[in-house]
Amino acid sequence: MRALSEKSGKNSYGLGSFWNGCHSRSERGQEISVLAWVDIEANTAYALSVEQTPGDEGKRQRKRKRKGKANSSAKANAKAKGDKSKSRNANYLDQVCRVASQVKSESLKYLLTDGAYSNKDFIDGVVASGLHQIGKLRRDSQLRYLYEGARRPGPGRSKCYDGVMDVEDLSRFDCLELDKETDLYIKTLNHPRFKRDLRVVVVVNTKTGGYALLFSTDTSLDARTIYEYYKARFQIEFIFRDAKQFTGLGDCQARSREKLATHFNLSLSALNLAKVEQAAANEPDAAFSMASLKRRMFNQHLIDRILSHLDCGQSLEKFSDEYSALCNYGIISQQAA
């Protein structure tokens, strides 16, 4: 997942024009790419890796190369800087491959992405790294049915495909009624542009008639699993929200690449530690709220200050029974405390 952070000035590393999903347009700023570990059972996510996306300098270098106007010194600098001459999609893929090679776990099998990462180069790279990708396809994707009939005898190539999928006719799909307003249709189809078979789930809103196309490179998954996994991807959005509101993700005034990287890592690490603290408090199933945690820590500090000025020990019986209740005063949810 990617997040855009506004940044004033002209000399900070990574400044460029990046897509802002909140405003549905490109805006100038700095972008970070975050890989997160999603806990499906606890319905939360932990930041695993954060890297800053190179800015527009890499684009300018590629344009000069295509036009043949780059001099020898510019080419040498581009070669020395390495990742700046790559496309942004290649930088995202490099990050995934590095993390996949470093994290050895049987539970790490799937990479959950949005539609921006649904392209052939990225999918091929993810599969080559040993992972399966679950993501979203364009609504107008041309998908082909696999031929399931008898093979004809004799020489020549056998029939492989059996027509193009029509969203208006899903009779050849297996249907699962998820709830009163949502039906899931699943089928293994071929994507000609990706040149591979995908497990495709058509999510249909029976009330409005709208639909979305989800996919998985693992053709053994069922419709509910693909849907639940893709829905869990949105927990990463809460990482950006909490980090920007409470741990200063977008407040760094540094300009160098190294200092910015340190700031981004510290901001997301603080958020991870807050979630680990809640899990260690024997509340693994409680809803996480950074605002409630901040309020509770403030209340605890205030009570301790008052007791210290009154020269009263916290172990006194008249304080010990109500201490926890006072610490929880003003929190959003008792479960989040």
Where are these regions (language model features)?
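Charge-patterned, long linear interaction tracts outside catalytic cores
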Residues: 193-220
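Electropositive nucleic-acid engagement tracts
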Residues: 2-10, 14-16, 98-99, 128-130, ...
